[in-house]
Amino acid sequence: MKFYTEDYWQGDVLNPYLYNTVCNHFNDEETVMGGGRKTDWKLHTKGLKDVDILIQWIDACIPEAAIQVSGGGSSKDYGAATFDRGGFKINQCWGIHYNKGQYVTKHNHFPFAMSFNYCVSAPEGSSPFILDEEEIEPIPGRIVFFHSHRNHYTLPNKSDGRCMIVGNIVYNPLTVSYTHLRAHET
């Protein structure tokens, strides 16, 4: 599977707070490749209550996202069975805000394991997220998880106020369950 999505059941309540948080924490020294404004890379470590709530939910989604984007959902599937579902951790997280004409150039997040984008705001005319040339419409409250090595971008926005919280996830290979590895070798 190229990507995995989940919808946050409290997105409509939390998103206005997240939008304000992103807009109030712009990093004036950096802009998005293609325009737009962004926060620094460690938004998830600032002790911001609304971001902490979102991150707690994202953390809970990561194990299932890892199974799905790895292509294996069965314990009999060797690839899905050999990684520790608790071995993933958000390493970077930042907010991005785009207005009309702003976009993101094609890029990827290698060498991270997975990346995500959570849609905070997508007014009419907001550009889709394009992952390996597949368009994914931004839907407020929806998160998209994908392998970090996949190329992605957005086209120029046709409206003001598109806002995302995005991030990169690392995997600690020291947490691989060798019990699972041995069980599948027999």
What are these regions (language model features)?
Residues 13, 28, 47, 110-112, ...:
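Intrinsic structural disorder/low-complexity segments
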Residues 1-85, 103:
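Non-heme Fe(II)/2-oxoglutarate
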Residues 179-186:
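Conserved small/polar residues in nucleotide/adenosyl-binding loops
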Residues 14-15, 121, 186:
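General structural signal for secondary-structure boundaries
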